[in-house]
A protein has these predicted regions:
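N-terminal targeting signals for export/organelle localization
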Residues: 1-46, 156, 160
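Thiol/disulfide oxidoreductase modules built on the thioredoxin-like
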Residues: 110-118, 123-160
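Hydrophobic beta-strand anchors of alpha/beta hydrolase catalytic cores
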Residues: 64-65, 95, 140
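A generic structural signal for alpha->beta connector loops
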Residues: 61, 92-93, 118-119
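Short active-site neighborhood of thiol/selenol oxidoreductases, capturing the structured segment around
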Residues: 54-76, 82
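Structural microenvironment flanking redox-active thiols in thiol-disulfide oxidoreductases
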Residues: 76-115, 125-131
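Conserved hydrophobic/aromatic "anchor" residues
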Residues: 2, 14, 43, 67-68, ...
């Protein structure tokens, strides 16, 4: 089952990598109430769109979790690919962002609205996700329905 999930998720995501134009939609700060969770041990992160705080290690999939920053050029280039993936997956795979190393929630919310993001975003004020995801961005994890990380992608997805 895990291999089918990984294969399907990667196929949809990588097929969307040929998309070079941004998706022309206005972003929206979305509630995290739809994120599937189990109990977690890491620090709970605030959701920019409301809902209970969620620990990064509590997320249950199928989910694609992308750790990013507004200041990160490769992260911004990935956004059309994730928007396209979300559109193609038709809700069968959650897309969740985790914003790190940010000045304020207001900066992140404005970025979301100006860059076509329409998925839930958690806000890592303290940098606690480094313990879970490691240093550097962008980082993308594929999480299965049991909450196990089944694939890690360090660095940006691109169209090559």
């Amino acid at each position: 089952m895990k291999r089918i999930f990984i294969g399907a998720a990667l196929l949809v995501l990588l097929s969307s990598c040929s998309l070079t134009e941004p998706i022309p939609i206005k972003g929206e700060v979305v509630s995290c109430e739809t994120i599937k969770v189990k109990s977690g041990k890491s620090e709970a992160l605030e959701c920019l769109g409301g809902g209970a705080p969620i620990a990064a290690d509590a997320i249950v999939g199928p989910a694609l979790v992308n750790v990013w920053g507004t200041w990160c050029a490769p992260c911004k280039k990935e956004l059309p690919h994730f928007a396209h993936f979300l559109q193609k997956s038709d809700g069968s795979v959650q897309v969740i962002g985790i914003a790190v190393e940010e000045k304020s929630q207001a900066v992140v919310k404005k970025f979301i609205e100006n860059n076509g993001m329409t998925w839930p975003v958690l806000y890592d004020k303290s940098g606690s996700t480094r313990a879970t995801f490691g240093m550097g961005v962008p980082v993308t994890w594929f999480i299965d329905e049991t909450g196990e990380v089944v694939h890690k992608k360090y660095g940006p997805f691109n169209s090559t």
